């Protein structure tokens, strides 16, 4: 059975295509304006559309349902093939940026005399890489370990000469010549980077470092790219000079011969085996046994070892902290954007299914799932959350790029470096809060929306299973979410306590504008009570600043009384989440209320305001206990929140299909049988399943058919189990 079906296509219960078409026709939301709002501008939206279309048309990047049946070995091989394909896209994107279409630009840029590659050279491919994460997360990570983690470790810690040598002359940022991995995590330490145990001992006689794994727990672990592909690694190790430990620094250590991929002397590497997901990434372990590297392979922007008798170590303690921020910021910032894009993909699938699927009611015209109030409550707030994320994710990325530009442009100017250090510390707090909150939200979204698709959501071919297994590592790597929330919460509490004590506290980001003495006093004195009525649009984000101030006040008083910061750790996690909600809602409001919203149609803007309200109402309801405990809202006001939310759901329902269409995701990118644009969920699903199954040599006859036949036809073989008569009698006791 193919598209030509024996089922009567006029039967309403079997016409999901018509139901989706009717839903699109019922809404007048301008999806192009919404897309521009989500992406930041019409120009950025056009580029996103162009790159998605390129990927959708490229079978080397996007795959059909067969993608979900690949073995681990096949995933590894397919991922390498895709990286090779992306390397060609990268070269072409640089040619477009430089308008040099018929030259070997990469070869020219690898020359020692070539100018430094600029951010504008890489801008198109940077955007492309964020979209790769939407299509194939393991591909994005395996390439990102090389370009982002290794690359940013060098950029953040290396001198200008080292940056140019490793990234440009050796070809790492072109995915050519060498391939990098990022060896920070150890078997015994993850989040506690300061206590990593791998050693880099300086040997004055040979002017080199000896890299050593002192014991089993110091084995580098979970290192993406290590098992099969990396030729070099940025290794985080303790700098030891003349017996003194100077803390963890970063070293470039060769692992393999790039021409043969054979391991170098003293390097032991293995695969860490199967994981929950992302098996296309060759995560491995690394041990070093007296591996020597030249002194120049230590990344020396902020810490230098000067040869001599005795050798000297020059450090900039304040600026050295930048290296810790720079290496991990890229991944955390990217994960916030990934949360938006990945969530958009699965919101689209579940929303389309909710309109096309019918169950119960009139047997001749069953009720669409989306018409049930409970289903609206399960699906539509998740869509609103993704909309809430978008402006905040774009702002965070812009702030990160701005900070990075300042950092790279500062050179050795200590004054400029000190200034950018303050910005990066605030960015570290902001990115930690948003990374944790958004990855948690998207993790919950994928599983909740899988359940809204019933049994069909459990099929691999509809995407949810692999997506969840691939996604949830985002809640752990590059900063465990709870640890990140504690770090962010502690920083916010420290700023709050300093302001209350009258100290001068530097605030670089508008998301922390509630940390002002006048506003704190206003909240404490009850001057913000009107906000709790949610009578104006700004109230929906400002309510979160009110609860943040009250929460911080409670934490500060508790720590003051018991002198135990750990006693408020649970509250600090909530503070970090609430700060993320405030930051995202504030930016959504600022963007939509500004002249730069790119939403000129009044009706479309009104729908977006409803989405904004729903996202805030949903979380107020979710954390109703905290709002009432801290007396931010009364029980009557909380009842009003719930009534508002239930009233707004059917209003958003009318526009939900067009709101998902506004993500501009091609079917090849969504890769879900029940999530296609046409809404033909049953035919698409059946055809995908039968097409994949057609590869079986004898459909319907399993390769273990003889085993089935034999045990079904067996005689009385009870005695073959070797169960004694005594044991048999005891079975009933």
Swiss-Prot record:
Q: What class of enzyme is it?
A: oxidoreductase
**What are the protein's GO molecular function terms?**
acyl-CoA oxidase activity; FAD binding; fatty acid binding; flavin adenine dinucleotide binding
Which terms are listed as keywords in the entry? Answer: FAD, Fatty acid metabolism, Flavoprotein, Lipid metabolism, Oxidoreductase, Peroxisome
Q: Which InterPro entries match?
A: ACOX_C_alpha1, Acyl-CoA_ox_N, Acyl-CoA_Oxase/DH_mid-dom, Acyl-CoA_Oxase/DH_mid-dom_sf, Acyl-CoA_oxidase, Acyl-CoA_oxidase_C, AcylCo_DH-like_C, AcylCoA_DH/ox_N_sf
* Record-linked Pfam families: ACOX (PF01756), ACOX_C_alpha1 (PF22924), Acyl-CoA_dh_M (PF02770), Acyl-CoA_ox_N (PF14749)
Q: Report the locations given in the UniProt record.
A: Peroxisome
Q: Which GO terms describe its biological process?
A: fatty acid beta-oxidation using acyl-CoA oxidase
- Pathway participation: Lipid metabolism; peroxisomal fatty acid beta-oxidation
- What chemistry does it catalyse, as a reaction equation? a 2,3-saturated acyl-CoA + O2 = a (2E)-enoyl-CoA + H2O2
Q: Name one GO cellular component term.
A: peroxisomal matrix
Q: Which cofactors are named for this entry?
A: FAD
Query: What are its E.C. numbers?
Result: 1.3.3.6
Principal place of residence: other
**Which SUPFAM superfamilies does the protein's record reference?**
Acyl-CoA dehydrogenase C-terminal domain-like, Acyl-CoA dehydrogenase NM domain-like
Q: Which family does it belong to?
A: Belongs to the acyl-CoA oxidase family.
PANTHER family noted in UniProt: ACYL-COENZYME A OXIDASE-LIKE PROTEIN (PTHR10909:SF352), ELECTRON TRANSPORT OXIDOREDUCTASE (PTHR10909)
Q: What is this protein called?
A: Acyl-coenzyme A oxidase
Species this protein is from: Eremothecium gossypii (strain ATCC 10895 / CBS 109.51 / FGSC 9923 / NRRL Y-1056)
């Amino acid at each position: 059975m193919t598209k030509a079906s024996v089922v009567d296509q006029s039967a309403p219960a079997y016409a999901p295509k018509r139901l989706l078409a009717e839903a699109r026709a019922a809404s007048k939301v301008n999806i192009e304006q919404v897309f521009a709002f989500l992406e930041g501008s019409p120009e950025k939206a056009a580029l996103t559309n162009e790159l998605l279309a390129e990927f959708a048309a490229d079978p080397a990047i996007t795959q059909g349902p067969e993608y979900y049946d690949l073995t681990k070995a096949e995933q590894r091989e397919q991922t390498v093939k895709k990286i090779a394909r992306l390397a060609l896209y990268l070269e072409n994107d640089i040619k477009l940026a430089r308008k040099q279409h018929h030259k070997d630009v990469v070869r020219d840029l690898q020359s020692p005399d070539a100018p430094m590659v600029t951010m504008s050279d890489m801008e198109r491919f940077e955007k492309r890489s964020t979209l790769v994460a939407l299509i194939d997360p393991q591909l994005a990570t395996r390439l990102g370990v090389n370009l982002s983690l290794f690359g940013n470790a060098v950029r953040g810690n290396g001198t200008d000469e080292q940056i140019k040598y490793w990234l440009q002359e050796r070809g790492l940022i072109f995915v050519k010549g060498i391939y990098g991995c990022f060896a920070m995590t150890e078997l015994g330490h993850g989040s506690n980077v300061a206590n990593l145990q791998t050693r880099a001992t300086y040997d004055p006689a040979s002017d080199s470092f000896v890299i050593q794994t002192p014991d089993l727990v110091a084995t580098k672990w979970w290192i993406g790219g290590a098992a099969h592909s990396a030729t070099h690694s940025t290794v985080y190790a303790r700098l030891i000079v003349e017996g003194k430990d100077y803390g963890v620094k970063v070293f470039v250590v060769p692992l393999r011969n790039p021409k043969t991929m054979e391991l170098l002397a003293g390097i032991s590497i293995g695969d860490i085996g199967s994981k929950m997901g992302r098996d296309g990434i060759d995560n491995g372990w690394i041990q070093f046994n007296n591996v020597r590297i030249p002194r120049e392979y230590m990344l020396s922007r902020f810490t230098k070892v000067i040869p001599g008798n005795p050798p000297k170590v020059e450090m900039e303690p304040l600026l050295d902290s930048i290296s810790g921020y720079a290496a991990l910021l890229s991944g955390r910032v990217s994960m916030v954007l990934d949360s938006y894009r990945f969530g958009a993909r699965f919101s689209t699938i579940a929303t389309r299914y909710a309109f096309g699927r019918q169950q119960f009611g009139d047997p001749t015209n069953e009720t669409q799932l989306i018409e049930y109030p409970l289903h609206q409550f399960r699906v539509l707030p998740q869509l609103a959350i993704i909309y809430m994320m978008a402006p905040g994710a774009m702002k965070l990325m812009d702030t990160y790029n701005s900070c990075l530009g300042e950092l790279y442009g500062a050179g050795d100017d200590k004054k400029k470096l000190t200034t950018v250090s303050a910005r990066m510390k605030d960015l570290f707090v902001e990115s930690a809060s948003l990374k944790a909150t958004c990855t948690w939200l998207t993790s919950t979204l994928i599983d909740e929306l899988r359940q809204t698709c019933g049994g069909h959501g459990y099929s691999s071919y509809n995407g949810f299973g692999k997506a969840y297994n691939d996604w949830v590592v985002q809640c752990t790597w590059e900063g465990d979410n709870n640890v990140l929330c504690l770090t962010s919460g502690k920083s916010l509490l420290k700023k709050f306590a300093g302001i209350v004590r009258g100290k001068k506290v530097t605030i670089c980001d508008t998301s922390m504008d509630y940390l002002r003495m006048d506003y704190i006093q206003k909240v404490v004195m009850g001057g913000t009570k009107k906000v709790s009525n949610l009578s104006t649009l700004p109230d929906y984000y400002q309510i979160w600043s009110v609860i943040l101030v009250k929460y911080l006040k409670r934490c500060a008083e508790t720590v003051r009384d018991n002198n135990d910061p750990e006693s408020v750790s649970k509250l600090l996690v909530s503070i970090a989440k609430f700060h993320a909600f405030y930051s995202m809602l504030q930016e959504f409001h600022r963007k939509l209320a500004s002249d730069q919203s790119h939403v000129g149609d009044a009706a479309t803007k009104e729908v977006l305001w409803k989405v904004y309200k729903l996202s805030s109402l949903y979380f107020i309801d979710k954390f109703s206990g905290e709002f009432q405990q801290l007396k931010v809202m009364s029980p009557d006001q909380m009842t009003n929140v719930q009534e508002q939310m239930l009233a707004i759901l059917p209003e958003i329902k009318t526009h939900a299909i067009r709101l998902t269409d506004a993500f501009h995701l091609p079917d090849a990118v969504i890769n879900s049988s029940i999530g296609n644009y046409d809404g033909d969920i049953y035919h698409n699903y059946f055809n995908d399943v039968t097409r994949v199954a057609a590869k079986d040599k004898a459909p319907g006859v399993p390769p273990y058919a003889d085993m089935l036949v034999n045990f079904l036809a067996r005689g009385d073989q009870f005695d073959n189990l070797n169960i004694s008569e005594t044991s048999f009698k005891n079975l009933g006791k």
